[in-house]
Regions:
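N-terminal cap/lid segment of alpha/beta-hydrolase-fold proteins
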Residues: 1-25
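Short beta-strand/loop motif that positions the catalytic acidic residue
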Residues: 242-244
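Active-site glycine-rich loops that stabilize anionic/oxyanionic intermediates
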Residues: 31, 35-39, 113, 246-247
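Catalytic active-site module of serine/aspartate enzymes centered on a nucleophile-bearing elbow/loop
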Residues: 267-304
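Conserved alpha/beta-hydrolase
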Residues: 43, 48-74
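Alpha/beta-hydrolase fold nucleophile elbow
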Residues: 101-113
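Alpha/beta-hydrolase active-site loop
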Residues: 79-99
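Alpha/beta-hydrolase-fold enzymes
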Residues: 119-205
Length: 304
């Protein structure tokens, strides 16, 4: 059973739209999913239903500036004044809501793409609230981040935070589709499932350009989650699972994704591992052979 809810961000009282999928029997645990950039919670319903059929309560919310967590449609891709810090605190607001709604159960946090950065920044501050972490579709650290950040700040200053810059969009993602250009989709790098791509390209809640404010905060979030400073690490044996498609251009290279894994070990999480799925692109939870990924995740979920 999947139900709709709305809660308020503890950061700035923004309405956060949320979905909850519950199992029919006694729940084994809770899984909170944190989605990526330029998408929304409904895209994860099949995965949520798979997990709830296996006995898990699944929760997901729309990030600020995404889906239904906006004041107006003009705010898609805009993170408001709270920015990336509020985005991270929104994850905690959902975690606290789950605590109110359900009995104490093993708690898993799964973040995809931009969400994979957000869940690491969340873990940096609140690792005592989770029992397992999945880092899915992780963007490797981009050494040009600082230049992009300067450009995004200048754009926001001179054109306004709501300005949508094609240049920022191109610099951020312009090369990702080159290996798949012959397939005829501008975002074929996302996954190889043609039905998913058709839905993606027809979905106005996916096919929007991030605002200058959004890019400022996206790049600041990348800096925070990769920085070795400020980690309030209290659970050194927290299982941290990096999972990505081997053909995901966000990886940059295997060496780069291994640096992300090494960083988590460096800050103290000894039980960190990496699984690359051959032939899969960015959205491994939506790939043609996604059941393989779903099964992999399910096998590693903590439960009572």
């Amino acid at each position: 059973m999947t139900t709709h809810h709305t809660i308020r961000s503890s950061y700035d009282n923004l309405g956060l739209a949320m979905l909850i999928s519950e199992p029919s029997g006694t729940p084994k645990g809770i899984v909170q999913i944190v989605h990526g950039m330029c998408e929304h919670k409904e895209r994860y319903i099949p995965f949520m239903e798979y997990l709830s059929d296996a006995g898990y309560i699944c929760i997901i919310h729309d990030h600020r500036g995404h889906g239904e967590s906006v004041i107006s449609e003009e705010d898609l891709g805009y993170m408001y004044k709270g920015g990336w810090q509020a985005l991270v605190e929104d994850i905690h607001s959902v975690r606290l809501e789950a605590e109110k709604m359900f009995p104490p159960l093993p708690y898993t946090l799964i973040g995809h793409s931009m969400g994979s950065m957000a869940v690491r920044s969340y873990t940096k501050r609140y690792d005592d609230t989770i029992d397992t972490l999945f880092v899915c579709g992780c963007p490797s650290y981009n050494n040009a981040r600082w230049a992009g950040s300067i450009l995004a700040h200048l754009t926001a200053f001179f054109r306004g935070g709501h300005y949508r810059s094609r240049l920022l969009q191109k610099l951020s993602f312009g090369t990702y589709n080159r290996p798949f250009a012959k397939e005829g989709y501008p975002n074929a790098w996302v996954c190889s499932d043609q039905d998913i791509l058709e839905q993606y390209h027809k979905d106005p809640l996916c096919m929007f350009t991030f605002t200058a404010n959004g890019f400022v905060n996206l790049l600041a979030l990348m800096k925070d989650c990769y920085s070795p400073k400020g980690w309030k690490m209290s659970r050194k044996h927290l299982p941290v699972h990096f999972i990505s498609g081997a053909d995901d251009p966000c990886l940059i290279s295997v060496a780069d994704i291994n640096k992300a894994v090494a960083r988590m070990r460096q800050v103290g999480y000894a039980d960190t591992d990496l699984k690359l799925f051959p032939g899969m692109r960015h959205e491994i939870l939506n790939e043609t052979n996604r059941k393989e990924v779903w099964d992999y995740v399910l096998e590693r979920l903590p439960h009572d």
